[in-house]
């Protein structure tokens, strides 16, 4: 009984120490996250010359990116697995 109480107490102390140590790193996390989100947003404005997975397409026009093919049945780009 005493051993399990000491083990639980040691676990709580370890959890507190790890949480306190990572707290300083977490203060910078929101700024880094926002900068990454806005950096990704800049790339959304650029259009590709081809259509990716799930984009609508017209069969026979070769609009899909490499390794994708336009499905005649569903009319969207899907992964081309060969014949």
Swiss-Prot record:
GO cellular component entries: extracellular region; host cell presynaptic membrane
The keyword Secreted appears for this protein: yes
Keywords for this protein: Amidation, Disulfide bond, Ion channel impairing toxin, Knottin, Neurotoxin, Presynaptic neurotoxin, Secreted, Signal, Toxin, Voltage-gated sodium channel impairing toxin
Predominant location: secreted
Tissue: Expressed by the venom gland.
Cystine pairs: 50-65, 57-70, 64-77
Location in or out of the cell: Secreted
InterPro entries the record matches: Huwentoxin-1, Huwentoxin_CS1
Alphabetized SUPFAM superfamilies for the sequence: omega toxin-like
Residues recorded as bearing Leucine amide in the entry: 81
GO molecular function, one term: sodium channel regulator activity
Classification via Pfam families: Toxin_12
Domain of life where this protein originates: Eukaryota
Chain residues in the propeptide: 22-48
Keyword Cytoplasm found: no
Role: Lethal neurotoxin. Selectively blocks tetrodotoxin-sensitive voltage-gated sodium channels (Nav). Does not affect tetrodotoxin-resistant voltage-gated sodium channels or calcium channels.
Record-stated family: Belongs to the neurotoxin 10 (Hwtx-1) family. 15 (Hntx-3) subfamily.
Subunit organization: Monomer.
Entry's free-text remark on domains: The presence of a 'disulfide through disulfide knot' structurally defines this protein as a knottin.
Protein name: Mu-theraphotoxin-Hhn2p
Native species: Cyriopagopus hainanus (Chinese bird spider)
Taxonomy of the source species: Eukaryota, Metazoa, Ecdysozoa, Arthropoda, Chelicerata
């Amino acid at each position: 009984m005493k051993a399990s109480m000491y083990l639980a107490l040691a676990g709580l102390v370890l959890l507190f120490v790890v949480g306190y140590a990572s707290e300083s790193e977490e203060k910078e996390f929101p700024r880094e996250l926002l900068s990454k989100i806005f950096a990704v947003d800049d790339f959304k404005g650029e259009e590709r010359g081809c259509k990716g997975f799930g984009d609508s397409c017209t069969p026979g026009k070769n609009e899909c990116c490499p390794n994708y093919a336009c499905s005649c049945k569903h009319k969207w780009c899907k992964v081309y697995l060969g014949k």
